[in-house]
Amino acid sequence: MYMKFIAAAIVSILVIAGSAQQGHAASAREIDQGVDATLERFYGKVKGARELAAKARGVLVFPTVVKGGIGVGAEYGEGALRVGGRTAGYYNTVSGSIGFQLGIESRSILILFMTDKAFENFRKVNGWNIGVDGSVAILNLGAGASIDVNNVTDPVIGFILDPKGLMYNLTLEGSKISRIEK
């Protein structure tokens, strides 16, 4: 019985993620516009964020990541990798979960690669699994927060924003990020 539930959950996740990929596929131009808007929102919410992004080897931005489910959930979003302020590729993020959940939510995700090694490790794999291929330290900051770029020591850091601002106590573990063609 338990194995049937797991199998059904996996199939549901794949169906939801697959339909999200087809139904929400944005053009390169739309993704770039969303990335620009998300970065500006991030810079406006966190003092020092612009300097931190400038120091990063690469900044991966997913402007809209939609998560939804009834018992079984899936999450999908498309974004762009920025290197030196320019788009260097397009990516998607997909994850699934099992447990009590009901509804749909949207958020933005920013991942900053702060070291050459972390950035190279991300770019060399086809499908980067957070928690397996690399860890992302989510920085929990309060409203009106600031970042001292000299005190950031993690090789990969992440920020999660909702329409109101930075979100707290969240994880990206289990998310898979893959390069896509646009």
Functional labels for PLM-detected ranges:
Residues 1-5:
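Positively charged n-region of N-terminal signal peptides that target proteins for export
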Residues 7-18:
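Bacterial N-terminal signal peptides
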Residues 19-25:
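Sec/Tat signal peptide C-region and signal peptidase I cleavage site
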Residues 25-182:
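Small-residue-enriched, tightly packed secondary-structure blocks
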